[in-house]
Amino acid sequence: MSQEQAEQLMQQMQMLETYFADLSQRENTFLGVFREATAAIESIKSLSKNPESDTLVPIGLGTYVPTKISSDSKIILNIGAGVAVEKDFPSAINYLEERIKEIEIAIQDTAAKKQDAAQRLEQGKAQVNQLMQAMQQSGQPPKSG
């Protein structure tokens, strides 16, 4: 393997490491959205059982206003692109469950891509180790870039 090929391999390894880190960040984002959607469903179910609940409404910078929830059948749901719609509890739960299915697919896809990237990283590390051994056996000192 030539010096140029070794440098290309190292660049590929760096790109793969960056890609793997990006996938990990995406996976964490998806997991956060998944937890949030699951918690929202549980909250809606709780509200349907106890409609006259006390709660805290955030008004910014860690400040909350105590209030009572008076609606036992409607909820405002952000559906994206700055659009919010009013839905009854079962419809809101159904919408959130559909979103959870989409998120689960995205998590699985991201996990598969991460596994592939990890495999390619391991192969690259093995190639680097072989290169280092070959260079040591030939008496050629490894050059750092």
Swiss-Prot record:
Instruction: Give the matching NCBIfam families.
Output: prefoldin subunit alpha (TIGR00293)
Lineage, opening ranks: Archaea, Nitrososphaerota, Nitrososphaeria, Nitrosopumilales, Nitrosopumilaceae
How it assembles, according to the record, is: Heterohexamer of two alpha and four beta subunits.
Q: Which residues form a coiled coil?
A: none
* Subcellular location field: Cytoplasm
Taxonomically, the superkingdom here is: Archaea
Q: What does the record give as the function of this protein?
A: Molecular chaperone capable of stabilizing a range of proteins. Seems to fulfill an ATP-independent, HSP70-like function in archaeal de novo protein folding.
> Which SUPFAM superfamilies does this entry report, sorted A to Z?
Prefoldin (SSF46579)
What coarse category fits the chief subcellular location reported for this protein? Answer: cytoplasm
Belongs to which family? Answer: Belongs to the prefoldin alpha subunit family.
Q: What is this protein called?
A: Prefoldin subunit alpha
Q: What GO cellular component entries does it have?
A: cytoplasm; prefoldin complex
**Keyword list, A-Z:** Chaperone, Cytoplasm
Q: Which organism is it from?
A: Nitrosopumilus maritimus (strain SCM1)
